[in-house]
Amino acid sequence: MTVIALFGAGGKMGYRLAKNLKGSRFDVRHVEVSDAGKARLKNDLDLSCVPVDEALNGAEVVILAVPDTAIGKVAAGIVDKLKPGTMVVALDAAAPFAGHLPKRDELTYFVTHPCHPPIFNDETDMQAKKDHFGGLFAKQHIVSALMQGPESAYALGEEIAKVIWAPVMRSHRVTVEQMAMLEPGLSETVCASLLVVMRQAMDECVARGVPEDAARDFLLGHMNVLGAVIFKEVDGVFSDACNKAIEFGIPALMRDDWKNVFEPKEIAASIQRIT
């Protein structure tokens, strides 16, 4: 049985992982510094936490379910206690991309992150429909990267990833650099920003007299059908009027050089701001 040391087990993300790992084939040792986190694990999942040294004794995998800003400090504090060949799993590309993982060639570094349940899905159960984050009831895709270590280690990392993010559909293999392009680049800098703009546009319509429920229903409904056409979920085309609105709308809303947010230096700067 593979031994996993789960750091940050009582935190927001760590708790999700602890819940999904419970009952799996993995022997999990839980590490949590906060009393509230320890109590939550004990009261909700009947899981006890252990000291760091006990958790690391014989551990083949260490999962760092801690904030991006803490990964470097936590990893530096345990790196000398890890035996050669130990796999260190990070749940986001930011800290690994920024170079916050210790330089030690005999360790394996594996990075994995959920895509979250897609807007277009086949969920019929209401609990799954309401599981927008994923990892509980709704199926989701995932991305993973073997940052360093033997190629043979990828299979174990992916197996763990499929457990902690379950239920999983497609599992995509990417590089750490590609994962950083996806987040923060695609998902946060672009998608989240444009969604905020859409919400602000809705609020502007409300401020100009449109009933709020009408504006919200109209926007979300159109996001559904427009998104289905744009992302090829349906075989459809936009009307001439819609295409003309897009032709004039993009230049009015977007800078000509907006794709520069995907340049390596911009991705690095974005990650530097959050780590």
Swiss-Prot record:
Q: Which domain of life is it from?
A: Bacteria
Q: Which residues bind Zn(2+)?
A: 113, 183
The cofactor named in the record is:
Zn(2+)
This enzyme's EC code(s): 1.1.1.421
| InterPro entries for the chain | 6PGDH_NADP-bd (IPR006115), NAD(P)-bd_dom_sf (IPR036291), PGDH_C (IPR031663), Semialdehyde_DH-like_C (IPR037161)
Question: What sort of enzyme, by top EC class, is this?
Answer: oxidoreductase
Per UniProt, where does NAD(+) bind? 11-13, 32, 68
Keywords associated with the record: Carbohydrate metabolism, Metal-binding, NAD, Nucleotide-binding, Oxidoreductase, Zinc
Family membership, please give it.
Belongs to the ApnO family.
Query: Which protein is depicted?
Result: D-apionate oxidoisomerase
Organism annotation = Rhizobium rhizogenes (strain K84 / ATCC BAA-868)
